[in-house]
């Protein structure tokens, strides 16, 4: 009888230990900041975007256009892993523009940043990396406009950019928001991004000398983006909001 009781007590202790370990792991996960990404091809990797139907440029299948073949080589995965963060949602779509005007003046409202900006979950940090395709596609610039946007306005870069930042500020409160500005874009796009970010008080990370192949970051370029983003955040850490949210969803 005593032997049975000892065995029973040991099982109870074992299960208690397992519960403690699980609780500790859950608490650790909840204390880690979560990151959501709103981007274009630079931030894609097949199988890691939400929704899964989003078009991807990078994948594990080797192709001559790039040397990036692992998600671990992407700028955003490096950034998350090296900072001890967790991925909330990567809502990136290859070829997408911020505004609703895409290549050949096509209607890109099915994939634009302003369409996808509502699907970022509940992160602690939002990284917006866009404007590249607006520049490459010669999307119309439009005027600087900070309210009262019309449907027509959202087919133009400047009002759409303002509309997007206005939305994320008001719908993702207590969240750190960064806009990452690519290299080699048209001056009008660069100046517009910086002016609109300044208007809303959004941190603009202006990249420098990123290594690319076929217009897209190489493995080296991905590392450069990660390092420049980390450096920017470190240098501006005193001004950042340190509040965290327990989980992504």
Regions found by a protein language model. Give the residues of each.
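N-terminal secretory targeting modules
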Residues: 1-71, 81-82, 119-121, 173, ...
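Conserved SGNH/GDSL esterase-like catalytic core that processes O-acyl groups on lipids
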Residues: 34, 48-142
């Amino acid at each position: 009888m005593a032997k049975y009781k000892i065995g029973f007590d040991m099982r109870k202790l074992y299960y208690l230990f397992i519960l403690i370990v699980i609780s500790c792991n859950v608490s650790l996960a909840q204390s880690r900041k979560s990151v959501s990404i709103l981007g274009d091809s630079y931030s894609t990797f097949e199988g890691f975007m939400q929704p899964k139907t989003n078009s991807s440029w990078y994948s594990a299948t080797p192709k001559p256009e790039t040397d990036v073949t692992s998600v671990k080589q992407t700028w955003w995965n490096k950034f998350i892993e090296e900072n001890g963060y967790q991925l909330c949602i990567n809502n990136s779509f290859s070829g997408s523009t911020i505004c609703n005007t895409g290549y050949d003046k096509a209607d890109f409202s099915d994939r634009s940043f302003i369409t996808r900006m509502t699907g970022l979950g509940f992160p602690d940090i939002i990284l917006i990396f866009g404007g590249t395709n607006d520049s490459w596609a010669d999307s119309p610039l439009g005027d600087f406009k900070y309210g009262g946007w019309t449907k027509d306005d959202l087919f133009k870069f400047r009002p759409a950019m303002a509309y997007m930042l206005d939305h994320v500020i008001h719908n993702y409160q207590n969240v750190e928001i960064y806009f990452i500005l690519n290299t080699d874009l048209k001056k009008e796009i660069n100046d517009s991004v910086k002016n609109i970010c300044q208007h809303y008080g959004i941190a603009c990370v202006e990249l420098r000398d990123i290594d690319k192949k076929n217009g897209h970051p190489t493995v080296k370029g991905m590392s450069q983006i990660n390092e420049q983003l980390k450096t920017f955040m470190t240098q501006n850490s005193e001004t950042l909001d340190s509040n965290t949210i327990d989980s992504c969803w």
